[in-house]
Amino acid sequence: MSILILEAFYGGSHKQLVDLLQEELEDSVLYTLPAKKWHWRARTSALYFSQNIPTSEHYRILFASSVLNLTELAALRPDLGKLKKILYFHENQLVYPVKKCQERDFQYGYNQILSCLVADVVVFNSVFNMESFLTSIGKFMKLIPDHRPKDLESIIRPKCQVIYFPIRFPDVSRFMPKHKAAHLQKILSLKENGGNAPSTALPFQQQLRGSENLLKSFDSKSGPCDAAQQESLGCSVRQASYLKTFNSSDDSSTHHGEHKQNRCDVLAEADDQQRPLHIVWPHRWLEAVYCGCYPLCPKDLVYPEIFPAEYLYSTPEQLSKRLQNFCKRPDITRKHLYKGEMAPFSWAALHGKFRSLLTAEPREDL
């Protein structure tokens, strides 16, 4: 086996990616740790892997997510340190998830910076993820009281590239209206390249109450917006409710807290696809849109990179107005055909980039 794949947090999108790579790429072997207690995975997984990965003269490439402290592993296992080392960022600890510096554990972000210095190639799942990480390095290192290292961004940036998270879209046409199923086939067969991006958190705590009250009033009385119309509010209102729950949760898994089930599988089972969408991982939104959801996203973070302008809002007031309009006019979302692109995010479009990435250059010292 020439490709060594390591995943220190084997769950959610981390699991989804490495399972796909191992299935599609011959000559690979996968070592993992369960997706729990991520803090401890980030701190100690390198030592565990160093003791449990057998030595092999056939390894040529090491692929790992940024949960792993690649620096420690390379030091503990010099044989692995000689491989072509690829580090994949699902999220970065310089901007996600904690916003306040005093609440952030310096070590996690510092370890990711060190891992980038050791890696041969650093891959991010979006331009936003890459730029937010690279441009935060300087400010982050100023937290060191004195004798600060310099020029880290300029050292790391040349190694960096963006390869979007690859989605293997299943056939969900039997769950969808015919006009949407036909449109789905059309947009998936279009050109297969990807897109560009910006930063901050979602603001809609206040407007959330108004949206929930709106739904309650529709429950309590009949009128121009009946139960069927409530359905078309679907993802957006429930997304807001989910975010409130997500933001208040203190479960230790929230750093990597995606639903473990593939969003396509979940939504395919749901009538009108009324499921909460995740705030951080853009591929979860794309999976939902693929299943017929109307995306309504903040004009911030990674979303402008993925979705056309008509699906973005800038203020809580705009969000509230859009939701109320959807409630009064449910046909807008029912009949809507997504105007963005899906093909650039499919495995069919991205497999060539991953195959090229996971091709070893000859190394004399192996």
Curated annotation (Swiss-Prot):
Any one GO molecular-function label of the UniProt entry: tRNA-queuosine(34) beta-mannosyltransferase activity
Compartments where found: Cytoplasm; Nucleus
Reactions listed under catalytic activity: queuosine(34) in tRNA(Asp) + GDP-alpha-D-mannose = O-4''-alpha-D-mannosylqueuosine(34) in tRNA(Asp) + GDP + H(+)
One Pfam match: QTMAN_N
GO BP annotation list: regulation of translation; tRNA modification
Record-linked InterPro entries: GT-like_domain_containing_1, QTMAN_N
Main location: cytoplasm
GO cellular component, one term: cytoplasm
Keywords linked to the UniProt accession: Cytoplasm, Glycosyltransferase, Nucleus, Transferase
Protein's name according to its UniProt entry: tRNA-queuosine alpha-mannosyltransferase
